């Protein structure tokens, strides 16, 4: 085992509008080139649009629900055994689940065709809440890969 000390996880400051660490983390995922105020405007605008469209009182709870729809439970990792590389299904730890869900939501939103990023993000959040959209599709694809490679689960690390 390495003798280095364990690195402490950084405490992320909650976002100014909702006081939520989850939304602050998502703003950081949406941010490009260090432009945080632009990313905040995009995320808050998207949450407002979705709240208006669907008559939602608590956008933070809605966002948590969307994240839960996108979070992967299992993923595949490459494992080399005797010259062959196997895709071994592994359970995803909670912090990585959330990080992957946020990354997939941000990527899926940026690939949509609406005019502004706030509109794209609002559309993707709406679709993800209904269990459709590119981010949910990505999660299902990862789950399918893990299911297809279930035979190699005895190679776990």
Curated annotation (Swiss-Prot):
CDD domains for the chain: uS7_Bacteria
Molecular function GO labels: rRNA binding; structural constituent of ribosome; tRNA binding
Presence of the UniProt keyword Ribonucleoprotein in the record: yes
Protein's UniProt keywords contain Secreted: no
A Pfam family reported for this protein in Swiss-Prot or TrEMBL: Ribosomal_S7
A Gene Ontology BP annotation from the UniProt entry: translation
Cross-referenced SUPFAM superfamilies: Ribosomal protein S7
Transmembrane domains' residue ranges: none
Cellular component, GO annotation: small ribosomal subunit
Keywords, ordered alphabetically: Ribonucleoprotein, Ribosomal protein, RNA-binding, rRNA-binding, tRNA-binding
Family assignment from sequence similarity: Belongs to the universal ribosomal protein uS7 family.
Subunit-structure text: Part of the 30S ribosomal subunit. Contacts proteins S9 and S11.
PANTHER family: RIBOSOMAL PROTEIN S7
Cited function: One of the primary rRNA binding proteins, it binds directly to 16S rRNA where it nucleates assembly of the head domain of the 30S subunit. Is located at the subunit interface close to the decoding center, probably blocks exit of the E-site tRNA.
Name of the protein in question: Small ribosomal subunit protein uS7
Lineage: Bacteria, Pseudomonadati, Pseudomonadota, Gammaproteobacteria, Moraxellales
Gene name of the encoded protein: rpsG
